[in-house]
Amino acid sequence: MQGEDPVSEIGDIFQLIIMEMLRKICKQDPSQKPRLMNAIFMMSESKSPSVLFECANTITQLTTAPSAIKVAIQSYLNLLQENNDNNVKVIVLDKILQLRKNYFKVLEDYINDILAIIKDDTIVSLEINQKVLDLITYLVSQRNIKEVVQFLEREILKATKMDEHGAQGTVTNEYRYLLIKSIN
């Protein structure tokens, strides 16, 4: 993997095979892990969503180092921002939610990126919004409470305006309920 060619020029399937091989080697021979983690980090720069997802999963399986977990979280967040498929977003959010207990401090640094997941003027998916709200309410701290409260207030106003314009009636009411529940 050394040389001038960027990771993105290697096909997705080949990248996934390499990722699986690296994961297996690291699990079978942990002494190889420090050397092979660099290759995994290089692959986290892939443009392929499936490779990015597998890379993040591999990192979280092989290490607990905060710097490595940051790479995994950033990969997950990139997937959330670049992907329009709600099913993919739900799966990725579930992965991030699994990290929240062990990596609270690391995730806390990404609160703005997490807030940005809910950015549309429409409610695309209540399930996605609920998972994001669950995550941000878990990550609220003295350091970020002001940002989170301002975000929740903006979202309540947005839902109220949508309701006044007759957009997405029941969904808007459910979303507003989730927001109010998050504040409490």
Segments the model singles out, each with a brief description of its role:
Residues 1-184:
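Extended alpha-solenoid helical-repeat scaffolds
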